[in-house]
């Protein structure tokens, strides 16, 4: 018979979702997976201590704020609707063109959803 052996040094003995406050704790304090929709942050400073320039570019490319809520379809659609309403109320021609492009994209998305629903029924 084979046995499953846990490895406490990599933290797989307690796999459970945790809150954002618990994410600030160090690895010895917690052995859990982040909540659904949140990425597992890489430890670049520890893994690649010599790549200073790449690390500074990575810090510039990944801002401190995140949009985890946009992974959910309803939140994404709501944010797109508010963005479109802001763009259509502006007086700038560039923003009006962006609103028209966003409207075309939303129409295409709705058409693809209709086609997908029809394919499921067939």
Swiss-Prot record:
Q: List the disulfide bonds.
A: none
| Keywords linked to the UniProt accession | Coiled coil, Plasmid, Secreted
Ranges in a coiled coil: 71-87
Tell me the impact of changing residue 29 to E.
In plasmid pYVa127/90
Q: Tell me, what's a Pfam family for it?
A: Type_III_YscX
Provide the induction entry: Temperature seems to play the major role in regulation of transcription of the lcrE-containing operon of pYV, whereas Ca(2+) concentration has only a moderate effect at 37 degrees Celsius, and no effect at room temperature.
- Domain remark in the UniProt entry: The region between residues 50 and 110, which contains the predicted coiled coil domain, is essential for interaction with YscY.
| General function of this protein | Required for Yop secretion.
Q: Which NCBIfam families match?
A: type_III_YscX (TIGR02502)
Tell me what else is known: May possess both an mRNA signal and a syc-dependent signal capable of directing its export through the type III secretion system.
> What name appears for this protein in its UniProt entry?
Yop proteins translocation protein X
Lineage of origin: Bacteria, Pseudomonadati, Pseudomonadota, Gammaproteobacteria, Enterobacterales
């Amino acid at each position: 018979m084979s046995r499953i052996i846990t490895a406490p040094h990599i933290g797989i003995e307690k796999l459970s979702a945790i809150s954002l406050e618990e994410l600030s704790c160090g690895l010895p304090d917690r052995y859990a997976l982040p909540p659904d929709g949140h990425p597992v942050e890489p430890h670049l400073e520890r893994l690649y201590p010599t790549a200073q320039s790449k690390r500074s570019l990575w810090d510039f490319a990944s801002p401190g704020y995140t949009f985890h809520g946009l992974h959910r379809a309803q939140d994404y659609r709501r944010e797109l609707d508010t963005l479109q309403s802001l763009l259509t109320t502006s007086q700038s021609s560039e923003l009006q063109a962006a609103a028209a492009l966003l409207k075309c994209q939303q129409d295409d998305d709705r058409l693809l959803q209709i086609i997908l629903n029809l394919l499921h029924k067939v």
